[in-house]
Amino acid sequence: MAGRKLALKTIDWVSFVEVMPQNQKAIGNALKSWNETFHARLASLSEKPPAIDWAYYRANVAKPGLVDDFEKKYNALKIPVPEDKYTALVDQEEKEDVKSCAEFVSGSQLRIQEYEKQLEKMRNIIPFDQMTIDDLNEIFPETKLDKKKYPYWPHQPIENL
């Protein structure tokens, strides 16, 4: 059990050190050595504790019934393993993040296509020194003045000036 749990929770120390500030490298090295020591001690433990030889204790303990009482209490002792209520939440958030990332990527692909069309349009326009005002208004419609809606000069709303 210790070995299996140990394999699940590993730290990528190379990337950890890359993001660590220079003045905290000593603290990071101490953390890494402590972590390696802890993992080595954890890996040396067996999955189940060794069996207790109750007959040996019955033979060597002077007070009768004491070992039997300890054995009953030891066998009745059940240490609960804390329930893992956060892994499901993290998995759900991961699925939502994957979904939102996929939406963002698809939206980005659409924006890229639109920008590539605009870029191609910009590459194919007439040079500005050869362009007439009609060509400019055709290529960039936002520059066209609306003389019907705004009959007086500057032919656009005052807010846009």
UniProtKB/Swiss-Prot annotation:
UniProt-recorded Gene Ontology molecular function terms: proton-transporting ATP synthase activity, rotational mechanism
Residue(s) carrying N6-acetyllysine: 32, 48, 63, 72, 78, 85, 95, 117, 144, 149
Domain of life assignment: Eukaryota
Compartmental location: Mitochondrion; Mitochondrion inner membrane
Cellular component, GO, one term: proton-transporting ATP synthase complex
Example GO biological process: proton motive force-driven mitochondrial ATP synthesis
Entry-linked InterPro entries: ATP_synth_F0_dsu_mt, ATP_synth_F0_dsu_sf_mt
A Pfam match: Mt_ATP-synt_D
Record bears the keyword Nucleotide-binding: no
Residue positions where N-acetylalanine is found in the record: 2
Free-text function comment from the UniProt entry: Subunit d, of the mitochondrial membrane ATP synthase complex (F(1)F(0) ATP synthase or Complex V) that produces ATP from ADP in the presence of a proton gradient across the membrane which is generated by electron transport complexes of the respiratory chain. ATP synthase complex consist of a soluble F(1) head domain - the catalytic core - and a membrane F(1) domain - the membrane proton channel. These two domains are linked by a central stalk rotating inside the F(1) region and a stationary peripheral stalk.
Stored PANTHER family: ATP SYNTHASE SUBUNIT D, MITOCHONDRIAL
Entry's family note: Belongs to the ATPase d subunit family.
SUBUNIT field: Component of the ATP synthase complex composed at least of ATP5F1A/subunit alpha, ATP5F1B/subunit beta, ATP5MC1/subunit c (homooctomer), MT-ATP6/subunit a, MT-ATP8/subunit 8, ATP5ME/subunit e, ATP5MF/subunit f, ATP5MG/subunit g, ATP5MK/subunit k, ATP5MJ/subunit j, ATP5F1C/subunit gamma, ATP5F1D/subunit delta, ATP5F1E/subunit epsilon, ATP5PF/subunit F6, ATP5PB/subunit b, ATP5PD/subunit d, ATP5PO/subunit OSCP.
UniProt protein name: ATP synthase peripheral stalk subunit d, mitochondrial
